[in-house]
Regions:
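Ser/Thr-rich, low-complexity intrinsically disordered terminal regions
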Residues: 1-114
């Protein structure tokens, strides 16, 4: 089972609007912003084991990049689990946690675009 997950999704909205919605989504999920580059439409965020009261079991690191695409924009998300010190977890991660965080992030992003 791969711990690193790569996820891409296209949206009809322009890249700046999608980037702003993605930032808002990370904040709504109580993510800790590690770095942000508004000019490059890119940010990195760390999520704790518990998101919106749901205990997931692992911390998760997400890198989100919004790119201009035909008829809108594309969101590229790369995510992986973290250990207690904040390093990339190479073994022992709980199954499905990273994908669950990506799904929650994507759901909030899409709600913020409405």
């Amino acid at each position: 089972m791969p711990y690193d997950i790569h996820h891409e999704k296209n949206y009809s909205q322009d890249a700046r609007s999608v980037y702003d919605a993605a930032l808002k989504s990370a904040g709504e999920l109580k993510g800790q912003m590690l770095s942000s580059s508004p000019n490059d439409l890119r940010f990195e965020v760390k999520f704790d084991k518990t998101i919106l009261g749901k205990v997931l079991g692992d911390r998760t690191h997400i890198t989100c990049v919004v790119q201009s695409a035909e008829n809108g924009s594309k969101v590229v998300v790369d995510a992986y689990p973290l250990d207690a010190v904040g390093r990339k977890l190479m073994f022992g991660a709980r199954k499905g946690v990273t994908q669950t965080v990506i799904d929650m992030f994507t759901t909030h992003l899409e709600n913020n675009l409405k």
